[in-house]
Amino acid sequence: MSMGTFLTDKKVKIRVNGSVPGEDIDFNEGAAVTSNDSTFSGVFRWRFGEKWSVAGQYWDSSDSSFVTLTEDIGWEDYTLKAGSNIGAGVELTVARVFFGRSFHTGARHEFGLGAGLHWLEFGAFIEGEFFINDESTGFRREAVSADAPLPNIGGWYWYAFSPRWMLTTRVDWLGITVGDYSGSLWNANAAINFQAWRHVGLGLSYQYFALDVDIEKSDWNGGADLTYRGPFISLNVNW
């Protein structure tokens, strides 16, 4: 089990279509939502039987900002005009469960494959003065949200340099249409772990999560392009 801090560098773009397809809204550049964040992250793995295991992961991230627009932003059939002050925010929660089977195990390495599920919750909002056909509709808040279980396949490889040092890698992938969602998902991690004591160790890894999805819901017709990446510093406990 690992617990620690995920230092994210995030890039968030969303699209909210109206009567015609809209353009991507860059929440980092256009809405000034910060690209850097730190959040708690937890990981566990339990081996049952000689070759089978189940693993899990959880982290979330949220941020909001206020900014003066430097260019127009389109939201459905509405426009927020350059020079106006707006508030904006995004949030993402990721929960992962993965069932795997090891296919090649040696004294210093292990390779396995499996399948799992990502439960994702994503939301974004913008508040300000909205215009349609150059006429103000007043100040208000508009928001979109989506949550869905997305299946994936994946694999992992571990290699122990010595009794105390180990390199671990894993990758999950999805490229499929599920219900109202179609697109791709990547969730990858590469880590170096040091076993400081018998049951306690330290870890430093690079975490990469990317989701590029088109959404066709009654309350959100559009899409999202999300990338969260950065180091994960952890305390590892094993028994």
Regions found by a protein language model. Give the residues of each.
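Transmembrane beta-strand segments that form the barrel wall of outer-membrane beta-barrel proteins
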Residues: M166-G179, G183
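Transmembrane beta-barrel strands of outer-membrane/channel proteins
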Residues: M3-L7, G56-D60, L113-W119, Y157, ...
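Transmembrane beta-barrel domains of bacterial outer-membrane proteins
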Residues: M1-N17, F27-S62, F98, S182-A190
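Repeated loop/turn-to-beta-strand initiation elements of outer-membrane beta-barrel proteins
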Residues: K51-V54, H109, P163-L167, R198-L202
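Residues on the lipid-exposed face of transmembrane beta-strands in outer-membrane beta-barrel proteins
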Residues: M3, G42-W46, V97-R101, A115-L117, ...
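Ordered, amphipathic secondary-structure segments that act as subunit-interaction surfaces
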Residues: L92-F98, T105, E110
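A contiguous binding-surface segment within folded domains or other stable secondary-structure elements
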Residues: L150-V171
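Extracellular/periplasm-exposed beta-strand and loop segments of Gram-negative cell-envelope proteins
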Residues: K11-S38, D60-T93, L120-A148, I176-Y181, ...
